[in-house]
Every structure is written in structure tokens, then in C-alpha cells.
UniProtKB/Swiss-Prot annotation:
Protein name from the UniProt record: UPF0285 protein MJ1370
InterPro entries linked to this entry: ATPase_NBD, Methan_mark_12
Family: Belongs to the UPF0285 family.
HAMAP family per UniProt: UPF0285 (MF_01087)
Annotated transmembrane regions: none
Signal peptide segment: none
Entry coiled-coil feature ranges: none
Amino acid sequence: MITVGIDHGTSGITTCIKDNDKKIIFKLKRTELKEKSYLEELEKHISLEDIDLIALTYSMGDGINKILPIEKVKNRGVLSIEGAGEKVGGGTKVYDEIKESGLPAVVIPGLHRGIECLDERFRALYSHIASPEKVSIAYYAYKLFGFNDFVLSDISSNTVTLLIKDGKIFGGFDACIGAIGMLHGPIDLEMIRDIDAGKITANEAFSKAGAVKIAKLYKGVENTKEEIINNYFNDENCRLAVDSLILSVSMEINSLLPLLDKNKRRVVLAGSIGTLRNPIDIPKRIKEFVEAKIFVLYGESGAIGGALIAEDILKGKRDILGIEVEFK
């Protein structure tokens, strides 16, 4: 059985090809995809006709409320591509190539008010909680560690923290709500004033409201994270930016832990920053603020989780962490 998981992330498109216990992972920068065919790149690693199922994520994923075959999905599964985050165009090209190819594929939804497994209070509070790759990451953590109850914090360009309770996604905080990531973060009073004054759009504010605003350093969506981390020990702004990120993520995790029984309080960290051990040990630093056992989900967890979702769908699973699957 060969499945493919595709993670449409901020800085690139990551692919996991899973052939039973073997995995092949490759990543393409979103800017690279403007000149390349995604399927041609995929075919360098696997014959397309051997693929049994692809699981795909795209943008906010707020236009669908189930995992659906790609041919049943309208408008790529989104209400609008406007909103939170920079638009580069690589993900759109990947999605359209796969749909036009006729390859068997399913589209994973994001977490939003239409997802019925979410607690009604979270659905009342927030229109959107997470983009689809966070579902894939949560599923990989669920399968790898075997936990039915845990808090997942995915820390990278942005930070999204989810609560999984009794094997279902219960709630969480989107990138624009609580903790900052390296690029994205919540909009504060100063930014609201700048938006109202017409100096910046809300989306532009969100896209640079993370650690980048404290570091006062921006090298584009693909290189800023590395630049800030590499300057942690020799630039005071970069040090403060990362320390502030650690504090904000810890506060977000701690706000969800009380919703779990004390003996079920576990934290899983994911993402390029959440799993970073050198030159800064991020999991160790977060543990200083969090009274729970911390586990680290290494690797390209969004793509791997997608491949696992596709595999389990082929095996007959029709519920992924509480999200319904429609597949024949």
C-alpha cells in the first residue's frame, strides 16, 4: 500500500511517500514550484500509477467539514484565500495538478465552526482554529505516542495549539489568537490603530506580528526563522524575540491543560521551532513553565500524518480524531 501525505505549509510544500514501513520525504519551496511541475517532482520518487491514495491539505480548509475525495471538493475546500498569511501560489499549483491528474486523493479540512467534534464553546468563540496540516500533525502524534488525551503545540512560522480529548479534537487556539510564531501572531492595540489609520492591512499585520516584530529582522517567509535563531546569542532583539515566543507558547499550553484530567496531562511539541534542540533547546525551555510531561514529535509531521491518514482511510477508517471521512 502506497500513500502520499502533502503538507501545504508557510515556507514550502512537504511530501511524505509511505510504502508500508518505508518513508520518502522531500520538500519544495513554494517559490520553486512556480517553475516546476509538482507531479514531475513526485514522479522522481515514485511511479504515479503505484499511488493508492494522496491526502492533501490546502490553505485554511474552512470550506469543507469532512475529509472528502478531491472531486467532491469545491473551491479547493476554502471559503476564500483572503485572510491570514502570505500568499505565494505554490500550494494552489500542487492542488490543481493533483485534481486534474485524476490520481486518487482526499482533502483534509481545517478546524472551524463547521467541524462537529469541536466543543461547542470553542466553535462559539472562534470561527477558525487551525489549518488542515495541524489535523495531520495531531494524527501523527496520536498514532506515534498512542495518547487519546494530549495538548499539541505546533511551533514554526506560526503557533497553533490543539487539545485532543478522548481521541477527538476538542478545541484549541489559531495562529491569530494567542501565542506568537516566528512570523505570525495576534494583532495588538498598536496594530489595530495602524490598520484603522490605513498604514497596514490586517493580514499584513498578522503576517509580521510574531517574533519577527520583536527581532526587527525579516528575510522573507523562507529564511526569517533561521536568521533569528542563528542570531539569538549575539543580537539582543533576537534573544528577546525567542524568549517572548517561549513564554507565549507556554501560556497557551497551560491554558488548555486544565481541560484534561491531571493524570492525562501530556504535551506534544511539533514544528521546526517546537522540536529545536540546538542552538536553543526549545522543549527544555518550555518545560520550565509547563507542569506536564513533554514529548517531541520530530520530522515532517504534517506530511507523515497525511500519509498515515490516507493509509488508515484505505484500511476502512471513517473517523480521524472525530472528523468524519467520506470515501468509497
